[in-house]
């Protein structure tokens, strides 16, 4: 059974990955950073920042150790393949159609080994950001506009240990394990979603003085659903019967039900909101007082000692108007591994209903330390706010990362190290220039270690810098350097 379910969600994940916040925590990230905290767009170095197209992508699992570079090599999906997405979303779980659309081979050709468990998980999410921009109206107000196509997919708590014992016939080596019949109730669920998204963002500065800056922001998002697909194993119990005379003819009885649901064309819509704030602690000797055209005093752009950001993203819902659902009772005997899951998935839908799903609501906490002018250390936590067992909620994976970086106007470099809730550790590298950013937070670990997770981020943009703000910042840096120089000189004289 799992041998049929697992490939579907792996192939879905191969072309629908997850957001990665590593590259969007620096001070030159521009409009892309609005995905994780809408307050980031204010107090920017940009007058206008235009995203042409970008993608943040990640897939992973707690089950298979895979060869990610072989997957990338085989994927037939380029910037001109506009029909590929349509083919995938219309495949309705058909493995042949998915393979044809993606250009991928069989799952086994990408797997090095499997780590079996009674609670295996697979996950993948993605945001493809289309034409988007931010506009810094003045020192205190900024607005943003985003367009995106997003994907979300996961399979949770599948008993791959039982899969290994029976379908791979490893019970031939240790049949006494199966004689205990201690499998309990087999549970598991999976879901995948895709949708269009348009967002409007606003950010402001309610507090600013010589040593503190507070930024707040909000994004309102309007969604249009493309496709949803899900399955649920309902109280599926198992009983193994060992044939002592002929071990290969041992059998497994399954009893319970499998529910499958798939959306079709209809008025699929949704709404979402992101909220966030950013607090900067600045060296009060650095900002230089200025006056705007109305005579109001403000503090010029200056380095901070540390910055604390907090936000909640994807607080909302996605409504599908035409969801066809079928629940199949399962009462079968699996002998000689002759069992076709397609008999229970995707045939004879019996019920049509409306269904609302909660978006993958996530809390983000970010602390950024300024070590010395261009050098920073960033710590970030992404925490999924719903229970993994919540039935009608999209899911994402909680993650913790530490990222040292070098940052300047025209180039930034990142060395992220992160670990997620499943204990998967990864490290990578990223690079940002004025018009291009590219990287992967797992590329280093994938080169030197076996991989259960792979990601990349890439994008093209048009930055239009605010020359006045850049000059203010550089002037503050020079003042900081001079003050440090005088301080060091005075220390030497005292000694």
Question: How would you label these PLM feature ranges?
Answer:
Residues 4-14:
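Sec-dependent N-terminal signal peptides
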Residues 19-495:
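Subset of outer-membrane beta-barrel
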